[in-house]
Regions:
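Phosphate-ester processing/binding pockets and catalytic centers
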Residues: 1-230
Length: 230
């Protein structure tokens, strides 16, 4: 069985030049069989920089900027180690980045459709991944505001029961599960992936993304709208 952990970057509201231009979903999938050793290596990485205390969570933005707990360590070295970990561990990455302004200008949907589209896109790609591997999977999401979690669960249940525009979801089982990011290694890694996508799409800096871009494969990352299509 494969476990897909997902986390969002940015807000889904209409772009007004004061909020985030992109809404991004980052995803990290790993097999239940690979989970124990992957988790152990992840804990070893954290212990390398915090040998005397248990690091509750790698919060990517704080790590990248050397803030909070990360101001007393070589945070750039830790960023490099996390990138290498993602690039070399038995992980498959997923990413959906929606340019909210262009999404509306091109008539691809209404403001409230941004979340729907991003979730549908990442579910489609996870389903294809499971079909190709002849496996089943579950999805675990970072817990956020209660009302937003309810919206995501309602959307997910609709897709699971009725299918997406392209697939009947025969390989994804049960409901979507929510847990705080500090309790799940996979969500922290998904946060890192989402942040790398944000740096690439918003800031024009692909230095993080490029280090593990191969882990997305050919079809698991999508920018919406596709800038190469008119």
């Amino acid at each position: 069985m494969q476990i897909l952990y997902i986390d969002a970057s940015g807000d889904p509201g209409m772009y007004d030049h004061k909020n985030s231009k992109f809404y991004i979903l980052g995803g990290v999938a790993l097999s239940e069989n690979d989970w124990p050793i992957t988790s152990a290596y992840f804990n070893d990485l954290c212990k390398k920089y915090f040998p005397k205390e248990d690091l509750e969570e790698i919060h990517t933005k704080q790590l990248f900027n050397g803030r909070s707990l990360f101001d007393k360590i070589d945070h750039k070295a830790m960023v490099a180690d996390v990138c290498n970990f993602i690039a070399t561990a038995h992980l498959t990455l997923f990413g959906i980045a929606i340019d909210k302004d262009q999404f509306l200008i091109r008539g691809l949907g209404k403001p409230e459709d941004v979340v729907n589209r991003s979730l549908e896109e990442i579910i489609n790609r996870f389903h294809i991944f499971l079909l190709n591997r002849r496996e089943r999977g579950i999805i675990v999401s970072d817990a956020s505001a209660e009302g937003f979690d309810t919206r995501i669960r309602t959307l997910y249940e609709y897709f699971r029961k009725k299918g997406t525009h392209f697939w009947t979801l025969t390989k994804i089982i049960d409901t979507i599960f929510f847990t705080p990011s500090q309790t799940a290694m996979g969500i922290q890694l998904a946060d890192f992936v989402a942040y790398a996508i944000k740096r690439k799409c918003v800031d024009g800096d692909s230095s993080l993304f490029d280090q593990f871009a191969a882990r997305f494969g050919e079809h698991n990352f999508r920018l919406i709208p596709d800038p190469n299509r008119k």
